[in-house]
Amino acid sequence: MKQFMDKDFLLSTDMAKTLYHQYAETMPVLDYHCHINPQEIYEDRKFDNITQVWLGSDHYKWRQMRTNGVDEKYVTGDGSDREKFQAWAETMPKLIGNPLYHWSHLELRRYFGYDGYLNGDTAEEVWNLCNAKLQEDSMTVRGLIKQSGVTLICTTDDPVDTLEWHQKIAADDTFDVQVLPAWRPDKAMNVEKPTFAPYIAQLSQVSGIAVTDLASLKDALKNRMEYFAANGCSVSDHALEYVMYAPASDEEVDAILKKGLKGEAISKEEELKYKTAFMLFVAKQYAKMNWVMQIHYGCKRDNKAYMFEKLGADTGYDCINNYAPSAQMADFLNELSATGDIPKTILYSLNPNDNASIASIIGCFQGDVPGKIQQGSAWWFNDHKLGMIEQMSELANLGCLGNFVGMLTDSRSFLSYTRHEYFRRILCELFGSWVENGEYPADMKALESMVRGISYNNAVKYFGFKLDEVK
């Protein structure tokens, strides 16, 4: 029996161990998509206790605590931090097979030097150990980032954001990790929502362009894209129910936009036409600006209405949406391709059943650069051992896995960089099994190049960041 989470955790073959320990383990971290707060990086926040850093905004953990019958008081309510930590600790032993069990223990080992395991009985010991460690100068937000080997972070930012914290970080020569904005214009696209008109008023104010029709909306968006680009942005992200394709004339889209600006009801057909036009417009701009377009789709959000009213979005009440017409995605990419306006694109589906369709679709639109159209890393509900293996295996079956840009945290926590380690171990185990089974030769030069590439170097080249590859 192997020891729990030893140095060869998740590595079962000699080749897997060689690939991980010689090539993947020491690679830096490029976190090209996350939800951390740049203000906390600039201000170099120091956390008072482990609950603040672990449970403050982690809806993955909240969801499992609720599943374990924990009262909301000890999840997001007014329970004390110590009580919330106890509730989480008592939940942990039941999470066998869940990536949270692995991630949490990796974080305890890497950042706090704790080699035991967390449960209700050890909670006091872990609480005291972690809280004492958090008072050390190396355990501030910047310290955690630096000791994690991070070279660059892309946050997630709205077009109306000032980007002041990114600017302050860039001007601070005491911190050499790049923290760049990423453009997330969902609020400008959600014409069917009651928040649309007030948001467009904000966009008008920030851009200095009064948005009254489709032409002025495009001008305002271009204005803000240029502002983001001037502040280092070269990455966008979109959260879609699915990748739709409902083409319409400019006149139709203009009329729909004007209805939205008046707060009038928008039909489903009108919503899809507006969103299609919006996505086609911004995608063409991304191609001109050499930005990468990320699309996350397949999520049905905020399913528990009264808790959404109480807590807001991203609080643990989302699920997989199994409606994703792949033909429309292909049609959307085809229109961009037909005019030479297809940007580098990364597609992520929350539904694991979409792996094969994505892998097959992206093969239709490649060109210019290696892996121009990517299948994104296993995301959210798929961000576990089996999900990662299935995503990479399907991409290998139907595409060119060696060009894959690899892992991202997609996290709100500064301890989540261990997810890159988790991913790399699974990657090396997968490659190792293929070599051990005689399905790929023990060509160490090729294997080293691919492992280093998927761990870090491919993303450096793909996104065009000002970073050096690691050989």
Please annotate each region the language model reported.
Residues 293-295:
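C-terminal amphipathic alpha-helical interaction region
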Residues 323-329:
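Divalent-cation-assisted or electrostatically stabilized phosphate/pyrophosphate-binding catalytic cores
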